[in-house]
Design a protein with these regions (language model features):
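Regulatory and interdomain segments flanking nucleotide-handling catalytic cores
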Residues: 1-439
Length: 439
């Protein structure tokens, strides 16, 4: 009965202004129940701020709203699907079974996910067109090609918190910013897909499955061999599209001291086998994205440059990235195999670029390149045992290799003088993902 104004509705985030207390109370009471009935298992966090007194100004109300939401997220919500003892449960989720289909006991959440087969809107956002359902991969195994590796990509815009603080002082500007940010992210994803090779785009089913695309977030599952190229193109286009669509808003509100008119993004890529649990792969991708952001902020605290971290999961251990790095990337206290993140731009001092990484990996895809891969693997093994022996063998290999770009690549990659890190581990991991055939 009263007016309701939508300020933001994207990526699981909704902000509304109510001009009627009764309408607000009705939504707060009924909205969580309606969502959990449609999508069992989803949890809803809500908060309300009355725009008066200290919170009369829109930006102050939004700041307080975010604080209250953080409190609500830390409060456990009772499950509506625990069920009673003695009833049959889904073998996969442990929740009460509501249906048997093809021998599988399905709980409410699984039933809802399987029934939600219309992915046309998500396809249109990710690819620019609503693809036919039969073109869309539903089984992760259908995404793979010459080997069993898939990639989970999670990308996230940089510095949105500080940007919203400046833009969010005016609700109309904040609404426009949110809508155009959504457009920029979707267009960047579409351009990234359009830039892929024709043999990738013409695969059946499509070897890329969008999971989340909205706001400044992107999460996709894709075939592993083109994941780095895809995410590099996405980040480049995210910068371009945000400059085109948001440049005037960023300038008007003097968001960046240097007058920057674009946004940037960081990404994490988890390379996993198709049989590896998606949840753990996603957690790793999110952790890698956070690692990339942390390094990028050191380069420019105002607007962190776009970059990506990736990791190839080689075992069945389920642990966070820092523990993986400590276990796998530190052969001794003086050496690290952790060379990333890899940056989009080439003007970041002493930081590797995605372009250089991909060019280096491409050089390994030849008969002579295979010999270099063998030398690099042996050198990495020697580093675990004795750094001095590894250096002796390195010099011997260099003395035997003919002059050329492969010799220069080996020399550059194994030079541990400064910093005491090597790109060899990442190169070999990515080369095996892109070129190794196991099926």
């Amino acid at each position: 009965k009263g007016k309701v104004e939508t300020i933001l509705s994207a990526a699981g985030n909704i902000k509304l202004i109510f001009y009627s207390k009764e309408d607000c109370q009705k939504i707060v009471k009924e909205f969580p129940k309606s969502i959990m009935e449609i999508a069992p298992g989803i949890t809803i966090s809500q908060a309300v701020v009355k725009m008066e007194g200290d919170y009369a100004e829109f930006h102050n109300a939004v700041d307080e709203l975010e604080k209250r939401l953080r409190v609500q997220r830390n409060r456990p919500m009772p499950s509506l699907t625990t069920g009673l003892m003695g009833i049959k449960r889904s073998n996969k989720t442990g929740l009460p079974a509501k249906e048997i289909k093809e021998g599988d006991y399905l709980d409410d959440a699984t039933k809802a996910k399987r029934k939600c087969s219309d992915n046309s809107k998500l396809c249109e956002k990710a690819f620019g067109e609503a693809l036919l359902a039969k073109q869309f991969p539903f089984n992760i195994g259908d995404i793979t090609s010459h080997n069993d590796w898939i990639a989970i990509i999670h990308a996230d815009g940089n510095g949105l918190g500080q940007i919203v603080q400046k833009v969010g002082k005016n609700k109309d500007d904040f609404k426009e910013f949110s809508n155009k940010l959504e457009q920029a992210t979707c267009k960047a994803a579409q351009e990234a897909w359009n830039a892929m090779e024709d043999d990738i785009k013409q695969c059946y089913p499509i070897p890329l499955r969008p999971v989340v695309l909205g706001g400044d977030d992107l999460t996709v599952i894709c075939r592993a061999d083109f994941a780095i190229e895809y995410v590099e193109t996405f980040m480049k286009n995210f910068e371009t599209q945000t400059e085109n669509l948001l440049g005037d808003i960023l300038t008007q509100h003097k968001v960046f001291d240097n007058g920057e008119k674009k946004l940037t993004a960081c990404a994490g890529v988890a390379f996993i086998k198709s049989s590896y649990p998606f949840y753990y792969g996603y957690e790793l991708a999110e952790s890698l994205c956070g690692k990339a952001k942390k390094d990028a902020k050191k380069q420019n605290s105002s607007l962190a440059p776009s970059c990506v971290m990736f990791h190839k999961v080689q075992d069945s251990f389920v642990e966070d990235y820092d523990k993986i790095a400590e276990r796998e990337f530190k052969p001794n206290k003086d050496v690290s195999f952790e060379f990333g993140p890899y940056y989009v731009q080439d003007n970041i001092k002493d930081k590797p670029t995605i372009k250089h990484l991909l060019e280096s990996v491409e050089k390994l895809n030849s008969e002579d390149g295979n010999k270099i891969k063998t030398h690099l693997r042996q050198w990495l093994t020697d580093l675990h045992e004795d750094k001095a022996i590894a250096e002796q063998k390195r010099k011997r290999v260099l003395s035997l290799l003919p002059d050329g770009e492969l010799k220069e690549l080996f020399k550059e990659t194994t030079d541990m003088s400064n910093p005491k890190k090597t790109m060899a581990y990442d190169m070999l991991a990515l080369a095996s993902i892109k070129y190794q055939k196991t099926k």
